[in-house]
Amino acid sequence: RAVPMASFPTLVRNIPTYQMVPDEAVELIHDESMKILEEVGCEFRDDEAISMWKAAGADVTGTRVRIDRALLMSLVAKVPPEFTLNARNPGRTVKVGGKNTIFVPMYGAPYVRGLDGERRYGSLADLNNLHKLAYMSPALHSSSSIICEPMEIPVPKRHLHIIHSALKHSDKPFMGIVTSKERAEDVVKMAGIVFGDDYVKDNTVVVSITNCNSPLVWDATMLDAMKVYARHNQPLILAPFALCGASTSASAVGAV
């Protein structure tokens, strides 16, 4: 007889998050960040994104966008403090944000290391096994997507195999692909096959990570993918591609 699969619920923190620096230092970092966006600005290398910033009231010169802090904070205030990330199995649906904590496998490794210690490029078989392990682990709330890159699959269709593996071998929430507009659209279509197109329109079913390029550049590839997911009401994690000691300061505070 099959053993029921255990799955931990979303963890809710009842203690404060770790504070690396005093509140005064956090405020100083925030103020300096606002000055950079107001005075230096950020490059948005996409015509539609530029038009959106103009319509929102930002100061736009060519592809350089300077954003007033009041405008920026008013836009940030529209982001919900938490949201529900729906799984194919409703019993594995989780809450993201607020005091909630979820655990997700890593994303984007080109290599895997076997039990024999050999380090090699990842394969589709490796990815399938990693998705199965993520599904079987009660402490993981998601199967991610690109736990490792299946390097033998040609890049133009690799994303299809990655998402198929995540959906086939796990019924936990999964993550999207952001390497092109077309691939993001394919992810949304595959989610529609699993959840139903109407359900996807009204519910969050996939979360994706996009990275700006240091220093201060959003390129067309990332912006195109962001627009696809946003127009389908799917959440995004916007993160800097910060490499401590390379593209940022080596210290945690300096990198922030």
Language model region names:
Residues R1-D126:
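Acidic/polar, glycine-rich intrinsically disordered N-terminal extensions of enzymes
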Residues G122-V256:
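Helix-rich catalytic cores of soluble enzyme domains
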